[in-house]
Amino acid sequence: MADQQTLDSSTPPPTQSDDLSHSHSTSSTTSASSSSDPSLLRSLSLSRLNAGAPEFVPGRTTPPLPQPPRMIIPPPPPHGMLHMYHHQPPFNTPVLGPVPIQPHLVPVQNHHPHHRFHQHHHHNRHQNQQYVPVRNHGEYQQRGGVGGEQEPDLVSKKNDRRDHSKRESKNDQVTETGASVSIDSKTGLPEDSIQKIVNQVEYYFSDLNLATTDHLMRFICKDPEGYVPIHVVASFKKIKAVINNNSQLAAVLQNSAKLFVSEDGKKVRRISPITESAIEELQSRIIVAENLPEDHCYQNLMKIFSTVGSVKNIRTCQPQNNGSGAPPAARSAAKSDGTLFSNKVHAFVEYEIVELAERAVTELSEAGNWRSGLKVRLMLKHQTKEPKQGQGRGRKGHDADVEHEEDDATTSEQQPIEKQSDDCSGEWDTHMQEQPIGEDQGNEKAAGQRKGRNRGRGKGRGRGQPHQNQNQNNNHSHNQNHNHNGRGNHHHHHHHQVGTQPSNNPMNNMEQPGMGKQQPPGPRMPDGTRGFSMGRGKPVMVQAE
């Protein structure tokens, strides 16, 4: 080993000059060979740049890429065959999901299935159109051979599809026509609309509606047979929205089993007549409930009021607008009575017997929560308590008045404003004559002013309330200063006509102011000319300002 290391160390390493001489000799040899083979010039230049790099030898040979298949243009179709093109859709057909492209697929324009056979005809019009690869495009050629021979079958199939769609649409129309309600030949209305109208008018003539409203009862009481003019029923909002004229409504109501239409078609009445005694008996079993809960549907109200006993009917009424057509006298009396122009949702509940209604008033009324608690009262009690206080009014007229008030508070759609104003004004004109005037006063002018005040306000109602009004009837009282007793007796004569006893003794008149203690609570309204009313049962002291 020592000898070998000595020999290796004694052998001089190759110097740089030897490498250069070797490369020069190699390059000279290469140049000689390159001059003979010109294709080796490129490899010679690369060998100069990196002479020390090993030569790259590929491990396998890459086969040449196959050329794409050539498209064979078929011959044009014969002259006797008409070639039809499909219209281009307004938008390109979207591609839902990726479609793998295989080498045998040909990109074809999406609007025509045989576009590759006729691309030379109109390729200039669709240069910017989107091309979608179509799978199994050769299926058309396999079925029909040449693309032009398949067109008649496609056209016939398209026509068959159109005919089928037309038949389906026609069948749908027939089905819809068959499902619709048939039209009545007499009235010209659908049968379902006729039944709705009949049910609505029967409800208007029902016992509960007649007992809680007075609009139809006034017409029933006026007619000896209990007829109501057909135009009155046709004026209701729900009927007016469906009916065109009165004769059409008369024809519709002939289908009712509870109503009878006159021969001329101008009047309608109940088949089973209703009497005043039946109305009073029904009203005694009805309670009026106010301050209802927020969710006052029929089911919830039935749960509340059925805890007392069996409930037959419940009728919920919306609040009445304050600006209805009643005169100021009727509105002020309504506030004192508590039955007119309710500004809250209220309900009429009909029980089986009177005892259940009285029990409901006792158990369901929330007296502790007077602001928002449930308020329950008897309907008939409010109608009969005021004649017991000696107001000098007949029972029949008072019942009609209270029923009229309930009608205003509940069913505003059944009470025209003009009729309501006329009836209220007529009733309050009658009440004006009932105001007892004839107190022993030294100032006849004040007595005449009280008379004018009572006529304008309509608030007397037999209470004997003294009032002040020094801006009315000044000339009338000045000319009648010498006829005090005669004027007083004249007014007592009017009281005798409406059912009260005449009073000629001034001492009897002095006892009447004591009745002011029974008037309903709450402030009285101002007269609008001098200020607020004073006294409330005390002797009036006229003060000069």
UniProtKB/Swiss-Prot annotation:
Coiled coil: none annotated. Residues 154-173 have a biased composition (Basic and acidic residues). Residues 1-76, 105-187, 382-545 are annotated as: Disordered. Pfam families: La. PROSITE patterns: HTH_LA (PS50961). PANTHER family: LA-RELATED PROTEIN 6B, LUPUS LA PROTEIN-RELATED. Transcriptional regulator. This is La-related protein 6B.
